From Swiss-Prot:
Protein name: Glucose starvation modulator protein 1
One example GO MF annotation: DNA-binding transcription factor activity, RNA polymerase II-specific
PAS domain: residues covered: 348-420
Entry superkingdom: Eukaryota
Residue stretches of biased makeup (Polar residues): 59-68, 122-139
rRNA-binding recorded as keyword: no
Location within or outside the cell: Nucleus
SUPFAM superfamilies, per database record: Zn2/Cys6 DNA-binding domain (SSF57701)
Keyword Secreted set for record: no
Disulfide bridge map: none
Gene that encodes the chain: GSM1
Primary subcellular site in the record, as a coarse category: nucleus
GO CC terms of this entry: nucleus
GO BP annotation list: cellular response to starvation
């Protein structure tokens, strides 16, 4: 079957000549000639029939559109950025320049990477220049003048210096050769993530939460209620406190820690304060030497010898588990292990405090160094103590013990569970000091200066099997007029 095209009036066609030679389909150099065979005209009029057979009527070469084998598809690697031609034609571009598609089409001289349009949120915002050259020059002149060197710095100027320093850090981060510019990433998601990281680095770090001693020992702090309500009172002074002015080396009292970590969310939201165990042990040693010293006391020779013997016994008990504690402490990875251990401690402390509110047993919670971190209201009222005085400074459980025998027995029991023995419960008896403060009445009518207790200790261990926390529940032994003891 052949197709006959109508003759255009005024034109004649010589035998054997094509339509393009008569000017109907003009030719131009560089454009491939369209064949005028009947099959070609049929392909032009019905292109869908040719496509159904897997052939394109205007295909340049069979090698350019040949089907790839599964091995070839698996072996080829897509490039991160295509060239202009492959990007416009939605073709698979290669890594080499010029790419294979451009070489096959004789477009090797025009093969270049496509230039992508930058999103609006990726555009860099320039920091507005501060018009203050005259003020900076006057500031340098003031620094050169010797008579004005003693003036304190202006807080507002110091704030501006901090702002300019952070902006300079951000600019150096963008212009640094070690950092990769945002335009080198070929994904908008990577570019956005890179910009967010730059903002995090340029912004100031989270405020420190180390509270100085002058605030930790302030007697005007409120009382921390452990048994009445879940919410602890907050003073306006603590809310307006500037955490950024704190020093990490300073001690943070348990009272301030109670303000910072009031729930589980606060432990993960705020910066974790590492606890300095060596300093706590040094304070414990100083207390023991002061407690068992007999200088300035009217003691007999036998009493002095007894105190000296008790102190040496305590030091020998401490020396038995001290090397294990030191070696484990040195093996920790700073600062992450210390932060993890302190987070675990604060998390367990919240759980045990919530548990102490559910029962009426007088409870004291202390660290492995003996430093008290929590105390129930029942025991505070029973001993006539002030909770703010106990928790606002470094107070050891040994300071509440009445006699030296109770202190020696404490170290003997703690040494039995410090290393090796993993028994987590201890039952013992001890005597605690009953010293009513001014304006505070105790619940006991005893005339003695102490109260004898039967206590149960629960030892909570950390990840390294060291005693992390000791929860002591104390049941008072009250004498009756008949000579029988009641619990």
């Amino acid at each position: 079957m052949s197709i006959r095209f109508p003759e255009i009036p005024g034109t004649t066609r010589a035998p054997g000549t094509s339509l393009s030679s008569r000017g109907i389909f003009p030719t131009s150099p560089g454009v491939p000639q369209i064949p005028t065979t009947p099959n070609s005209y049929s392909a032009l009029l019905h292109p869908h029939k040719s496509e159904a057979k897997g052939k394109h009527p205007l295909s340049f070469s069979s090698s350019m559109t040949k089907r790839l084998t599964p091995q070839e598809k698996k072996a080829r690697r897509p490039t991160s950025r295509a060239c202009v031609f492959c990007h416009s034609k939605h073709l698979q571009c290669s890594h080499s320049r010029p790419c294979q598609n451009c070489i096959k089409r004789n477009l090797a001289h025009e093969c270049r990477d496509v230039v992508r349009k930058r999103a609006k949120y990726m555009s860099t915002t320039e920091v507005p220049a501060v018009s203050g050259e005259s003020s900076s020059e006057s500031g340098r002149a003031t620094g050169e003048n010797g008579s004005e060197m003693g003036n304190p710095p202006d807080p507002q100027i110091a704030y501006l210096d901090g702002v300019f320093e952070r902006s300079s850090i951000h600019e150096s981060l963008q212009d640094s050769p070690m950092s990769t510019p945002a335009s080198n990433f070929n994904s908008n998601f990577l570019n956005q993530e890179y910009m967010m990281l730059g903002d995090l680095i340029s912004k100031p770090s989270s405020p420190s939460l180390d509270v100085p001693m002058m605030y930790a020992e302030n007697p005007s702090r409120p009382f921390i209620s452990l048994g009445q309500s879940d919410e602890r009172p907050k003073s306006p002074e603590f809310n307006n406190f500037d955490f950024s002015s704190l020093d990490k080396a300073q001690y943070v009292s348990p009272l301030v820690s109670h303000h910072i970590y009031q729930n589980v969310q606060d432990i993960y939201a705020n910066k974790v304060i590492d606890f300095d165990y060596p300093s706590s042990y040094h304070s414990l040693t100083s207390f023991l030497r002061q407690r068992f010293s007999f200088t300035g006391k009217s003691l007999s020779d036998s009493e002095k010898a007894k105190k000296r013997e008790n102190l040496l016994m305590i030091l020998r008990l401490i020396a038995s588990y001290r090397p294990t504690f030191i070696s484990t402490h040195k093996a920790l990875f700073r600062p992450f292990d210390f932060q993890f251990l302190e987070m675990s401690f604060q998390r367990c402390l919240l759980d045990y405090e919530n548990l102490s509110r559910l029962n009426a047993s007088p409870t004291i919670i202390w660290r492995r160094t003996g430093e008290i971190v929590s105390m129930s209201n029942d025991l505070v009222a029973l001993l006539g103590l002030n909770i703010s005085t106990i928790l606002s400074k470094r107070t050891f459980i040994l300071e509440l013990m009445y006699d030296d025998e109770s202190i020696v027995e404490y170290f003997r029991l703690f040494e039995s569970v410090a290393v090796g023995n993993l028994h987590s419960t201890i039952v013992t008896r001890c005597k605690l000091i009953k010293r009513p403060s001014e304006g505070i009445e105790t619940n006991t009518s005893m005339d003695s200066d102490y109260i004898e207790f039967c206590s149960v200790w629960t030892v909570k261990r950390d990840l390294f099997d060291l005693p992390m926390m000791v929860v002591g529940q104390f049941l008072p032994v009250l004498p009756t007029p008949d000579g029988f003891r009641t619990y």
